[in-house]
Amino acid sequence: MTQTTVKNVKNYIGGEWIESRTEKTEDVFNPATGEVIAQVPISTTEDVHHAIEVANEAFKTWKEVPVPKRARILFKYQQLLVEHWEELAKLITLENGKNYAEAYGEVQRGIENVEFATGAPSLMMGEQLASIATELESGVYRYPIGVIGGITPFNFPMMVPCWMFPMAIATGNTFVMKPSERTPLLANRLAELLEEAGLPNGVFNIVHGAHDVVNGLLDHKKVAAISFVGSQPVAEYVYKRGTQNLKRVQALAGAKNHSIVLSDANLENATTQILNAAFGSAGERCMAASVVAVEEDVADEFVTLLTQKANEIKIGNGLDEGVFLGPVIRDQHKERTLQYIESGEEEGANLVRDGRTDEAAKQEGYFVGPTIFDHVTSEMKIWQDEIFAPVLSIARVNNLEEGVDLANESRFANGACIFTRDGGSVRRFRETIDAGMLGVNIGVPAPMAFLPFSGWKDSFYGDLHANGKDGLQFYTRKKVLTTKWV
């Protein structure tokens, strides 16, 4: 790719594409080739303050737009997303690296979130009690809260923003988004389609950048709430700084999701599900399967079957036919992953499959093949840390209780899955596991748009989760009206 094809990314503020006030930029890479595809501005505090002021001014009129009219704009937006799904999926693969089928799935999940937000007229209905005392009645009414700041990650550049801004603007708020500087192109395309759908200027804005933009959102008095998805250290930082500034904050953080495979499980299904959950999206998702606790009776068979399937995975550019495993996002992330593999070896885990030796891992791009460790213990870094890469740890346990205890040792608690045919085991798992999203005989128990994305412990900071009724409640506040008729 020649330098003349490199795209100059701009901010989107008040319905206009605006150059940042900064001269500092970062390269955006195609992780499958290492080629530069764009340059993104590392915007200034002044840039984000400008966007916040514009959004605050737009809020004064947008909040007065009838809810059904706001919903109709989102209906149009949903139609445009459907019409452009192929383009959007290719763009995701280009700048994120995941395979085209996974990118298509992400587009569909984003569209589903927009569809859910179009139900705002029903979702925002209040409550009434006709008689709370003699000739007294009370009613509850929902209202938007103001300017929302959204900080989104590279791993789901469409789905995660669509968790946030459709519901936020459907409920009458305005929005300033800071997408990942690694995947800015998809974010800007979403803005273009919103404009085409008829969204008024200033209701949705994008400011690209890094720390200054994040801090600008967290500190500005006219930002009412912050929605964040990203790594645990940054999530904790966002939550603490945002709440210190008296903002509502929902901060979705890292994970170390455990699957428990019991001896009565269908191993064909279990290995297929876990393979997809561990190595799909190159392991760069907060619902990835990171650890498998497998009962000793079937552990050897499980490891053999899983490794056989991992050996059949096609690695390469996500736009190429048949590719399952694409690259990790950056060369630095690849190097970090290789360090974790070395750490696992040094700490005594059995390296069953070494993703460093795959042919694709030696080519251009940021590839690491599927990597499997056996005999992993909770003292090892590969068990403790979120690696965010195609690295799976297998621990051997004697029973369900040991598997649950192992999972509950982790400070992360996004998701957990069990593979079994026994209903009693499922119930004990459900009641004793410390995690927010659970699966039975599936590998990725991520909820649909109408249910909360409900991580626990260090996987989430806040009270109201993303999606579902939690999302609606996070972006609204209530008035209670009590009336005496005389």
Swiss-Prot record:
Pfam families: Aldedh. InterPro entries: Ald_DH/histidinol_DH, Ald_DH_C, Ald_DH_CS_CYS, Ald_DH_N, Aldehyde_DH_dom, MeMal-semiAld_DH, MSDH_GmP_bac. Gene3D superfamilies: Aldehyde Dehydrogenase, Chain A, domain 1 (3.40.605.10), Aldehyde Dehydrogenase, Chain A, domain 2 (3.40.309.10). GO terms for molecular function: malonate-semialdehyde dehydrogenase (acetylating) activity; methylmalonate-semialdehyde dehydrogenase (acylating, NAD) activity. It is an enzyme of class 1 (oxidoreductase). It catalyses: 3-oxopropanoate + NAD(+) + CoA + H2O = hydrogencarbonate + acetyl-CoA + NADH + H(+); 2-methyl-3-oxopropanoate + NAD(+) + CoA + H2O = propanoyl-CoA + hydrogencarbonate + NADH + H(+). Pathway: Polyol metabolism; myo-inositol degradation into acetyl-CoA; acetyl-CoA from myo-inositol: step 7/7. The active site is at C286. One of its GO terms (biological process) is inositol catabolic process. Its EC number is 1.2.1.27. NAD(+) binds at F154, K178, E181, R182, S231, E386. Keywords: NAD, Oxidoreductase. HAMAP family: IolA. Catalyzes the oxidation of malonate semialdehyde (MSA) and methylmalonate semialdehyde (MMSA) into acetyl-CoA and propanoyl-CoA, respectively. Is involved in a myo-inositol catabolic pathway. Bicarbonate, and not CO2, is the end-product of the enzymatic reaction. Homotetramer. NCBIfam families: MMSDH (TIGR01722). Belongs to the aldehyde dehydrogenase family. IolA subfamily. This is Malonate-semialdehyde dehydrogenase 2. It comes from Oceanobacillus iheyensis (strain DSM 14371 / CIP 107618 / JCM 11309 / KCTC 3954 / HTE831). The gene is iolA2.
